[in-house]
Amino acid sequence: MTHTEVVCAVVVTHRRRELLATSLDAVVSQDRKPDHLIVVDNDNDPQVRELVTGQPVPSTYLGSRRNLGGAGGFALGMLHALALGADWIWLADDDGRPADTTVLSTLLSCAHTHSLAEVSPMVCNLDDPQRLAFPLRRGLVWRRLTSELRTDSSSSSGDLLPGIASLFNGALFRADTVDAVGVPDLRLFVRGDEVELHRRLVRSGLPFGTCLTASYLHPCGTDEFKPILGGRMHTQYPDDETKRFFTYRNRGYLLSQPGLRKLLPQEWLRFGWYFLVSRRDLAGLREWIRLRRLGRRERFQR
């Protein structure tokens, strides 16, 4: 008897009920519907529970009385999916959505064709889908357009960008892959949790990549990335102080880990240039150093 693969969709939300409704509608409207929907609500909102239980696919609502952040929310949802017997785990958040009804089936087909442990769609700007929602660095070159990713493809079919993926936004994991690389690190809360899991995925040696024929729509996140050196490099500077705290502290931890330490010289160059030359902000550089030191020492108190 042929085993029918079970796909569990995991969506994490926090106080975005209307956006969540739009996201869930796109998730459950796929031509290959997920077999089970799991929604982790970091606000434990009864209205969100009602929304989830009213979906047209079997659904589980996990309301948390403590905000677990994106990292903890996805960790909880992924573990619950494994406990339900999922063969594949499809991740989404509340402010993004699959671009069309074929995304899940396309990802599954790509994963089977290329024997992938994980596959992600391109994450595109919600308002301009020809542009990426987040710039993607390839060596020292930043890619901002979907067409630029397609020119990087090394697969014979032209549908796969191997060895790099945007995690959580439409990412599809084999269950066995989660056994090998684990779930997101709760301590990171928000910011950098996807980079850390990507680091583990790379070090595992498992095959993964970005499917260039599937897209996931997400609000533009490029505003945080400030160009330096005439646009040849970029530095991340969130306008919100809280986001800067988590971004810089967590990067301090990330760049102390195996597989990412090689980026340290470039990190110091980029941020040193940005704070001292672009902003002329010595106090900002000192705060960046303080926050990254907290992360390097694994001081994750909020």
From Swiss-Prot:
Keyword Transferase: yes
Primary enzyme class: transferase
Pfam family, one: Glycos_transf_2
Involved pathway(s): Cell wall biogenesis; cell wall polysaccharide biosynthesis
GO CC annotations on file: extracellular region; plasma membrane
BP terms from Gene Ontology: capsule polysaccharide biosynthetic process; cell wall macromolecule biosynthetic process; cell wall organization
Biological function: Involved in the biosynthesis of the arabinogalactan (AG) region of the mycolylarabinogalactan-peptidoglycan (mAGP) complex, an essential component of the mycobacterial cell wall. Catalyzes the transfer of the first two galactofuranosyl (Galf) units from UDP-galactofuranose (UDP-Galf) onto the rhamnosyl-GlcNAc-diphospho-decaprenol (Rha-GlcNAc-PP-C50) acceptor, yielding galactofuranosyl-galactofuranosyl-rhamnosyl-GlcNAc-diphospho-decaprenol (Galf-Galf-Rha-GlcNAc-PP-C50). Thus, GlfT1 is the initiator of galactan synthesis, while GlfT2 continues with the subsequent polymerization events.
PANTHER family on file: GALACTOFURANOSYLTRANSFERASE GLFT2, RHAMNOSYLTRANSFERASE WBBL
Name under which the protein is recorded: Galactofuranosyltransferase GlfT1
Primary gene name: glfT1
